[in-house]
Amino acid sequence: MKNKLLVVIIIVVVIGGIGAVIGPKIYRDYFVKKADKSPESKISDNQDTVKVADLAGEWHVGDGSYAGYRVNEVLNGTDVTVTGRTKKVSGNIVVKNKTLESATINLKVADIKTDASKRDDYFRTKALETSKYPDATFVLSQPVKLDKGAATYNVTGTMMIHGVKKMLTIPIKTGYHNQRVQLASSIPVTFKDFNVNAPSLGFVKVEDHGKVEIFLSLTK
């Protein structure tokens, strides 16, 4: 009985110490899921050959697409990278005369999930107020001339987060594989630019900036 009691006490001390000095590495290594890879890594190295002229038409977001965010947390000097993801992404792009004429991307912010439900609840209710602002969007504002089927382009458009719109120029990596257009982007954002307070998770400090991440698999 004494041995069992000792084991219970040890477990309680270890878990309770997550927020204390002894806990940073335990928190990072055992209580936080390893961060997902960047969306750019999803673009296949095995690209199919395609002529830009053959990309003409309207393409729609298909299965396999996702969006979300990447932020860094700091616990007593120990860095932890957190990624949140949702598959509830919609939108389309239009290619005409070897030019990206239009693009609209919409994601359901309330559906973004990480490995921690409490973090997700804070994200929805306190940080982004998803009951008021359920969507985040990106809308292309300037046409982009396309010279390759697979390349990286700087694209200018309006991003809306938390009801706040900002004009941004973002890098988008493109590819073509299995008759699908692939688009990937990691967009640096500073929370205060969108009237969002950096999430406060008690013993964990969340940095005041992060990335919006998007991977799109588009079909005609």
Locate predicted features:
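Low-complexity, acidic/polar, glycine-enriched regions of mature
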Residues: 2-220
